């Protein structure tokens, strides 16, 4: 099942040189795991709540692939280039399959409550 790496980042007004190096190197860390950047820093349109910062969404063929990428020596080597300069949150999450049914999920959650 397709999985995603989703990051909510809060970059400073001036990006340090380390961030540019990170950006130059990240795709090479994604390629071996089938990672594809779907959203990267585009302007978000906030409809509910607040959203300071930038959104990054990376697609992977599976949660196993996403975990392997994040834990890979190649990514660990560049992670600090971003993380030391841009605070944020990152999660890895499974996507929904083509047969996802929100109503059935709601019924199951109600029954379990």
Question: Where are the language model's segments positioned?
Answer:
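Short S/T/G/P-rich N-terminal loop/turn motif that feeds into the first structured element of a domain
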Residues: 1-54, 61-68, 94-113
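A contiguous, mid-protein "functional segment" used to position or interact
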Residues: 67-98
